[in-house]
From Swiss-Prot:
It catalyses: a purine D-ribonucleoside + phosphate = a purine nucleobase + alpha-D-ribose 1-phosphate; a purine 2'-deoxy-D-ribonucleoside + phosphate = a purine nucleobase + 2-deoxy-alpha-D-ribose 1-phosphate. This is Purine nucleoside phosphorylase DeoD-type. The gene is deoD. SUPFAM superfamilies: Purine and uridine phosphorylases. GO terms for cellular component: cytosol. A purine D-ribonucleoside binds at H4, E180, M181, E182, S204, D205. Homohexamer; trimer of homodimers. The keyword Transferase applies. Keywords: Glycosyltransferase, Transferase. It is an enzyme of class 2 (transferase). GO terms for biological process: purine nucleoside catabolic process. The active site is at D205. It comes from Streptococcus suis (strain 05ZYH33). HAMAP family: Pur_nucleosid_phosp. It holds the Pfam family PNP_UDP_1.
Length: 237
């Protein structure tokens, strides 16, 4: 048992999906895992362990933002021995050619957060995905005929900021695919503790095409492509 997770030793698999929304974790457990058992309800951050195609897999919500995912990922890695962590979440498109419901695999994640700089004030460290997971996820998505983009994303500390909104659009002109709030922290912890990390996002809205949008219920229950890719990537040899 850790500070924020009530699981006992052995109740969490060494590979895990990390949606931001705890209700999406519940949805994944109920619709994709066999014999799923809930191992955490602390702060309503639901976590489950079950099997997917015969492989033991866990799924747990992380909440929104870099501080929240940092807490849960840190404890999963250091207290429960998790070795593969894949974020499955939503993002806003910054590119004209990246549309709602399409997938983005974050090759790297820039960030305006200063949290990583607490550890490394002298450097701006690049936060990158584990290449093995990235490569597997890309080929799995292609085999499943899913429209998939690979590139940089922005992990932002702010959701509502008119000033950052215009700056984020400029990042899109530099090829940044989308904006979200967690990937950079997950990648940093992967590098720090020597585990494999990847972020797979579904585009839920677009900053360049505002008419493209999805509802909260759709974001919770219908973005199944990234869930399939995430699970297949976790169990791929």
């Amino acid at each position: 048992m850790s500070i924020h997770i009530s699981a006992k030793p052995g109740e969490i698999a060494d590979k895990i999906l990390l949606p931001g929304d705890p209700l999406r974790a519940k949805f994944i457990a109920e619709n994709f895992l066999e014999d799923a058992v809930c191992f955490n309800e602390v702060r309503n951050m639901f976590g489950y362990t079950g099997t997917y195609k015969g492989h033991r897999v866990s799924v747990m919500g992380t909440g929104m933002g870099i501080p929240s995912i940092s807490i849960y990922a840190h404890e999963l890695i250091n207290e429960y021995g998790v070795k593969k962590l894949i974020r499955v979440g939503t993002a806003g498109s910054l590119n004209e050619d990246v549309h709602v419901r399409e997938l983005v695999l974050a090759q790297a994640a820039a960030t305006n957060s200063r949290m990583i700089n607490i550890d490394w004030p002298e450097y701006d460290l690049p936060q990158i995905a584990d290449f093995d997971l990235l490569d597997k996820a890309y080929h799995i998505a292609k085999e499943l005929n899913m429209t998939t983009h690979v590139g940089n994303v922005l992990s932002s500390d702010s959701f509502y900021s008119p000033k950052l909104f215009s700056r984020n659009l400029e990042l899109g002109q530099l090829g940044v695919k989308a904006v979200e709030m967690e990937a950079a922290a997950l990648y940093y912890l992967g590098a720090k503790f020597g585990v494999q990390t990847l972020a797979i996002m579904t585009i839920s809205d677009s900053l360049v095409n505002p008419e493209e949008d999805t509802t909260a219920e759709e974001r919770q229950n219908t973005f199944t492509d990234m869930m399939k890719v995430g699970l297949e990537t976790l169990i791929a040899e």
